[in-house]
A protein has these predicted regions:
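Long, highly charged low-complexity segments
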Residues: 1-18, 30-86, 100-105, 109-123
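Aromatic-residue hotspot detector
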Residues: 6, 239-240
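Glycine-biased, low-complexity coil/linker segments
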Residues: 23-25, 31
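Active-site-proximal helix-loop-helix substrate-binding element of RNase H-like nuclease domains
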Residues: 40-45, 81-232, 241-244
């Protein structure tokens, strides 16, 4: 996102010396989000460990006008990453994690990897089911590693954030605090740091579910916060819709 041409164009659209009202539209309002009670937003999360649960969530995804989607993997390198699990959200606070490849002593029984992906394939590859994510290009690469093509990509909150407020941080933790007043679970909190860090496939499933479902939930909530901001600025909305999203 550090493209000089894009930054120059964005400054021209926003104006080099914005007035107070333009500055407000560029992101000042998000700084004042009231801090929410820790964990209060996570009460409706599920961990999908049986086929009945998965079928129920497939019905929710099929009916949702827009669903947030995220992957948990073995690597930050999308070309090397292998899928560990997927998370979904269909409404604020209504999210789930589907663990598929956690590996540690005493791990609960997980759904069969290939069979679960086969069930998800029609939704993942459906252009008529609108999906959003945070840095979806990464998730698209991960799915491609497993022979799946993500279709129906409608929105990306990281791209929207960059267009709306190019001078701010665009990681989910920062955005959640800035726009929603929510302190999220950090990756280091579930995997550890330094030499003691473990792979996500070694994270306890219930802890992983809390983290992963939150990712999808926060993505959906951020979309709700950022979309009106884009709508206020037709030129920025056009930049997001016509330039940024199509090149994903």
């Amino acid at each position: 996102f550090a493209r000089l041409e894009f930054k120059t164009w964005l400054r021209e659209l926003q104006g080099d010396t914005p007035s107070p009202s333009a500055g407000e539209r560029a992101g000042v309002r998000g700084e004042g989000a009231d801090l929410q009670p820790p964990g209060a937003h996570r009460t409706g999360y599920e961990t999908i460990l049986d086929w009945t649960q998965l079928d129920a969530w497939l019905q929710k995804l099929d009916a949702a006008p827009l669903a947030a989607f995220d992957t948990e993997t073995t690597s930050l390198d999308p070309m090397q990453a292998r899928l560990v699990g997927l998370s979904f959200a269909v409404a604020p606070g209504e999210a789930a994690y589907l663990p598929l490849a956690h590996r540690y002593a005493g791990v609960p029984q997980q759904l069969t990897f290939d069979e679960a992906l086969a069930k998800l394939k029609p939704w993942l590859e459906s252009p008529r089911h609108a999906k959003l994510g945070q840095n979806l290009k990464y998730d698209m690469h991960v799915l491609a590693n497993h022979g799946l093509r993500l279709e129906g990509v409608a929105h990306d909150t990281m791209l929207a954030s960059y267009v709306v407020e190019s001078d701010k941080s665009h990681d989910m933790d920062s955005m959640a605090l800035r726009h929603l007043g929510i302190a999220t679970i950090k990756y280091d909190e579930v995997t550890g740091k330094g030499a003691g860090r473990i792979g996500f496939d070694q994270v306890d499933i219930e802890r992983a579910a809390e983290y992963a479902a939150e990712d999808a939930d926060i993505t959906l909530r951020l979309h709700g916060a950022l979309s009106p901001r884009l709508a206020e600025e037709p030129r920025l909305e056009a930049l997001y819709r016509d330039i940024e999203m199509p090149v994903m």
